[in-house]
Amino acid sequence: MATFSDHETSEFLPMTRPRSTSSASQTSSDSGLSSEPAFQEDQKQPFSAPNGTTGMDNGDRYRDLEDGEAEANEPFLASSKKAATGGRARRIFWLLVLLCFGGWLLAFVLFLTGGRANYQSASDALQAQEPESASGSTSSGKPVTLEQVLTGQWSPRYHAITWVAGPNDEDGLLVEKGGGEQEGYLRVDDIQSRKNKDGKGGRVLMRKPIVHVDGKLVVPGNAWPSPDLKKVLLISDQEKNWRHSFTGKYWVLDVESQTAQPLDPSLPDGRVQLALWSPKSDAVIFVRENDVYLRKLSSDRVVTVTKDGGENLFYGVPDWVYEEEVISGRSVTWWSNDAKYVAFFRTNESAVSDFPVDYFLSRPSGKKPDPGLENYPEVRQIKYPKAGASNPVVDLQFYDVEKNEVFSVDVADDFDNDDRIIIEVVWASEGKVLVRSTNRESDILKVFLIDTKSRTGRVVRTEDVASLDGGWVEPSQSTRFIPADPSNGRPDDGYIDTVPYKGYDHLAYFSPLDSPKGVMLTSGDWEVVDAPAAVDLQRGLVYFVAAKEAPTERHIYRVQLDGSNMTAITDTSKPGYFGVSFSHGAGYALLTYNGPSVPWQAIINTHGDEITFEERIEENPQLTSMIEAYALPTEIYQNVTVDGFTLQVVERRPPHFNPAKKYPVLFYLYGGPGSQTVDRKFSIDFQSYVASSLGYIVVTVDGRGTGHIGRKARCIVRGNLGFYEARDQIATAKIWAAKSYVDESRMAIWGWSFGGFMTLKTLELDAGETFQYGMAVAPVTDWRFYDSIYSERYMHTPQHNPSGYANSTITDMAALTHPVRFLVMHGTADDNVHLQNTLVLTDKLDLSNVKNYDLHFFPDSDHSIFFHNAHAMVYDRLSSWLVNAFNGEWHRIAHPVPGESMWTRFKRSLPVLV
């Protein structure tokens, strides 16, 4: 599919696609949607009055009629005739008395209940709505409920398999959990044995999902087979640490005997942070309490590799900021291919300041407080380097397994210790290792080649990205080592890396290892994504994922190592968003179709020139059935042009969309550098719920700074986060406000994390001109409060760029008085975007006497907001708050009518006797 282009007479070219069993799509959010109960039921109707608004004309949009108000100044019972005398008069008199009493009682009830601004929850509003007539869309069925979204009922099923190399380097082996007719709990199959319906032909690694160790029942939560498939490393009692890291108790299962023993027999209950198999299957390197240990399976003895790990020194595992911003994982330990060496990080946090996180209800340490301290919160001190503050000092160390010796290799790189960020380590052959590192501001990349045998190293490649295009180096761990093979035309070792090339990210092949210039494998006005995916060394083929057909799509391609014969292996004639994982030799792959239609998975054979399907392993029939039963939004993908930049947009229209109506519009955004929210994945998420059940239009635009639209559009935001991104949101909102079917007086914007920052920044810049409402969850409000590695990558240091930090901070409180109202929510135990951001903003609002906002805090919740039903509550609050915004509740609060005294109102309620 060709990329949309601009048109002389239109600012965008739409491509309309209603939801059906053959097509659906997805956006992703920094916050995510997960299993939590919510309030809404399936039978609720879309929240939309018959005329497409709230049921009020323009004059009454923000003012409901108070109960009884129309009759308040009229006599309850009046007559122009005089009362008769005698018995008739007495009867009339008592009748009047009764009527007066009844009128007074009714007036009193109306006084107690009438005229108040009723805060209306989304569920209450939905119950009160009449279903709108079907028009504009052929979709039929029930609306999507928030409960369905939060509990994952709309989430596709994906088959979990792991490719492994066989003991004799066989290709096409995979590890998966058994089920159905397949024998065993954990098993290894090759592609051919999977075709046997009786399950025979594979190898069972674990017969049961539980194991017994010295009479103790162990229920493993995860398993890692050894390379020779004779043993399995198990983890139990797993506890989360940060986003990626966790600890647990580790066990080693012998496949033949189905017996297990502790990883460290001398300390069976010790909590381990990381454990990795040796490539020879004869040892496990592991980390406990920030020190590295080696267990050789030939004995029960554990070798201590490092001894001084602790609160300020981390060995083999990342600290908070490296886990979050550099590695995006829990391991900084790497075995050499020949199992002779282990490389690992030594992280010194002595100079990094602590940030306290209070826990008022829970105790993450698991420790019982001392007597008398039960009512004090637990305080967790986190080593958290903020922008401009001291960074952790990270060194790469090596362990010689045979000599039982730890050493380091000094390389002159012109980076000071606190000005170096190591972003990737890749073992080559014969004890050589490639190390990619950047300066603190992530705009100079240096590649080192270290020889562990001679214990020497040197810089072999330098890229000054700041001078190239003013951009930055995004950390990644996708560099691929290519061993020499003269018989296949590769006389020297080499590697494949992603490099900037003519304004886009592309693949280059560097050979030999110390080559400063690579052979370009890809080129063009499009970008590769997390590439390469795999390399077929026998055929000299490089497989990769790219956004070539459109920024919103992902297809799989392959190219020769000399850059020739690039071809797609997925169908590029229609929109698609594919993912892939390859077998050890790249002869097979698990192909995952993520959308826009219902996702499916298949194992494919890539040995020949033609790709063949071996087995379709997942088709998600339950989603196909649900799509037929529910009224889903129509999604329209299009482009807008802002300041000459083409931006991707998706508009979600409610079922039965009627262009003659006026609809409220919610903008949803994330907008962080290199991110993407507008894509062709299948998803029924919170935005889908808003369109389907509440009847609002939802628009998402990926503005400047986001990913896969070229480096020029991406790098322009550097040093001034929020400046261009907010303008793109406002410019797009103005385009929508001018549409005939949009109610320009009811437009809102919301986002989480960076999206929360963008919500506030957009409201600040817009000053109520376009957006009347906003909802910000866990927002950054000052980039000096965020971590150093992320902030400085996109903003430089505060010392280097003080004006940029000042401009990016939410400071214009006067501008924030112009929207009708905005909402800010935050978890009090957010270790990522600290509560400090919202508290400092609140203080600024107080000092400026700003009142048009609401706050909601979630005790003990971190950045994902999950603690004690918080995840359900945060989305319920978003939904309810939005309903009240578009129903005019917040406008009534902002423009209150002066109230009457109780006595005046009581007198008005009395009947007038004539």
Swiss-Prot record:
Positions on the Vacuolar side per record topology: 113-914
Biased composition (Basic and acidic residues): 1-10
Organism, scientific name: Aspergillus clavatus (strain ATCC 1007 / CBS 513.65 / DSM 816 / NCTC 3887 / NRRL 1 / QM 1276 / 107)
Record has GTP-binding as a keyword: no
Region (Disordered), start-end ranges: 1-63
GO molecular function ontology, one term from the record: serine-type peptidase activity
Membrane topology: Single-pass type II membrane protein
Family recorded in the similarity comment: Belongs to the peptidase S9B family.
Phylogenetic lineage: Eukaryota, Fungi, Dikarya, Ascomycota, Pezizomycotina
Catalytic activity, EC: 3.4.14.5
Functional note: Type IV dipeptidyl-peptidase which removes N-terminal dipeptides sequentially from polypeptides having unsubstituted N-termini provided that the penultimate residue is proline.
Catalytic activities: Release of an N-terminal dipeptide, Xaa-Yaa-|-Zaa-, from a polypeptide, preferentially when Yaa is Pro, provided Zaa is neither Pro nor hydroxyproline
Protein known as: Probable dipeptidyl-aminopeptidase B
InterPro entries: AB_hydrolase_fold, Peptidase_S9_cat, Peptidase_S9B_N, Serine_Prot_S9B/DPPIV
Keywords: Aminopeptidase, Glycoprotein, Hydrolase, Membrane, Protease, Serine protease, Signal-anchor, Transmembrane, Transmembrane helix, Vacuole
Database matches in Pfam families: DPPIV_N (PF00930), Peptidase_S9 (PF00326)
Cytoplasmic side: 1-91
